[in-house]
From Swiss-Prot:
The lineage of its organism: Bacteria, Bacillati, Actinomycetota, Actinomycetes, Mycobacteriales. It is found in: Cytoplasm. This is Octanoyltransferase. HAMAP family: LipB. The keyword Acyltransferase applies. The gene is lipB.
Amino acid sequence: MSSVEGMAQSIRSGTEPVRVQWLGRIDYQAAWDLQRELAEERIAGGPDSLLLLEHPEVYTAGRRTLAHERPVDGTPVIDTDRGGKITWHGPGQLVGYPIIGLAEPLDVVNFVRRLEESLISVCASFGVQTGRVEGRSGVWVAGDGGRPDRKIAAIGIRVARATTLHGFAINCDCDLGAFGSIVPCGIADAGVTSLTAELGRTVGVAEVIDRVSEAVLDALDGRIALGVASSPGVDSAQ
């Protein structure tokens, strides 16, 4: 697990408050279309946005996804332009899409690390100790008692014209069995977990939303110290 750096400056180019929207459960394609609309608005001088939502069940593949990592049962997959590999979205998983104009000089890896740090702090607020794993993006519960490292939150983004799209997903009380048909995030030697699985009680999306929103905004604006680790899962098209 990572050591900690000091506080950072805001990574946003703008100073206006981030517009936070809770969309409820929304189709993946509809949310993707909305992201692109908001990104164009941001590029034209509009506000930063943070979309929080759930998706109906869907598999999405990042640009680095390999053929053998896709569902073995032929389940449809939406191919996306984000970084990272294949993952699952569905009910019980809180998804966040920050549409943010990044400050110069662009530091995309630092942006990803801020998202990771925000989710680490959210997990800690529930009493779940998490951190980073060197060379692997996302947020992890360390292996214990014969169990492997377990991913509790995934991150995959794209940056185009200094503006971010896609984002993160944290498992609250989702069906972890849905990950069984794929190699989640291309990592075959690790597991997947959720807040509910780690705590032994139901932790629904509604209980997590406000904590995630606050932590992400704090991390983007430098109010949360950053740990030290590399962060793959980035696709940059400046």
